[in-house]
Amino acid sequence: MIAPTFRPATSSDVAALHRLVESAYRGDSAKAGWTHEADLLGGQRTDEAELLDILADASRVILLAEVDGVLTGCVQVADQGEGLAYLGLLTVDPTRQAGGLGRLLIAAAEAEARSRFPATRMEMTVIRQRSELIAWYERRGYALTGETRPFPLDDERFGLPQTRDLEFVVMEKALG
């Protein structure tokens, strides 16, 4: 794999960023990768307005991964206060998954959380039914906390649930 470069997203990246996220999380294109939610959720994963809101918030950043100038992945880091940061929107182009880019994005997000906020812990939420993804995060040093959070079942901005028993599990890692 060619080493990616990482940089913070800007408003001029939003259209391409939105296409990347949707291609990795929803619909038939997502099924080219192993991390999709297409069997659990239809509809959208996010929209351009939400991405612009994230970029306008000084407590959040979206890091882009580019290879030879081509957008290949992204991750959001958000300051939660008291040394806690949140990792979300981890996205790798479905045609490039299983090549190590996800690990590099997590490492970049953790470094960003330590330097920008400065965080000593990182948390994330994962849909409970995504056991293969939970196991992947565990191999990256994240542990289940035992906490669950409700999935916004009736908010179409986050997708159209194919089942009503969706919920998030919370995972956390101490940042060294």
Segments from the language model and where they lie:
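Conserved acetyl-CoA-binding loop-helix of GNAT-fold acetyltransferases
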Residues: V92, A98-A111, R139
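Conserved beta-strand in the GNAT
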Residues: L64, V70-A78, Y86-T91
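A short helix-loop-beta-strand connector motif used in the catalytic cores of GNAT acetyltransferases and
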Residues: T46-L63, R164-E167
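Conserved GNAT-fold acetyl-CoA-binding loop/helix
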Residues: E22-L51
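A conserved beta-turn-beta hairpin within the catalytic core of GNAT-like acetyltransferases
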Residues: D79-L90, Q97, R116-T120
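C-terminal "cap" of GNAT-fold acetyltransferases
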Residues: T120-A135, R139-G176
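Conserved N-terminal entry element of GNAT/NAT acetyltransferase domains
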Residues: M1-A15, R19, V169-G176
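Conserved acyl-CoA
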Residues: L104-R121, A143
